[in-house]
Amino acid sequence: MKVRPSVKPICEKCKVIKRKGKVMVICSNPKHKQRQG
């Protein structure tokens, strides 16, 4: 899980979602997981 100020999809399987007010990227590749904050 990477925590960074700007989250962007890295590959075509990355999905940008909102959970509890936080913007997150979920992907089948665990290296692509990101959270904003």
Curated annotation (Swiss-Prot):
Which GO annotations describe the biological process of this protein?
Answer: translation
- The question of whether Ribonucleoprotein is a record keyword is answered with yes
Q: Which GO terms describe its molecular function?
A: structural constituent of ribosome
> Single GO cellular component annotation?
ribosome
Pfam families named among the record's database cross-references: Ribosomal_L36
Looking up InterPro entries in the UniProt record yields: Ribosomal_bL36, Ribosomal_bL36_sp
Respond yes or no to whether keyword Disulfide bond is given for this record. Answer: no
Keyword set, alphabetical order: Ribonucleoprotein, Ribosomal protein
Q: Which family does the record claim for this protein?
A: Belongs to the bacterial ribosomal protein bL36 family.
Q: Which PANTHER family match?
A: 50S RIBOSOMAL PROTEIN L36, CHLOROPLASTIC, LARGE RIBOSOMAL SUBUNIT PROTEIN BL36C
Name this polypeptide is given: Large ribosomal subunit protein bL36
Q: Which organism is it from?
A: Staphylococcus saprophyticus subsp. saprophyticus (strain ATCC 15305 / DSM 20229 / NCIMB 8711 / NCTC 7292 / S-41)
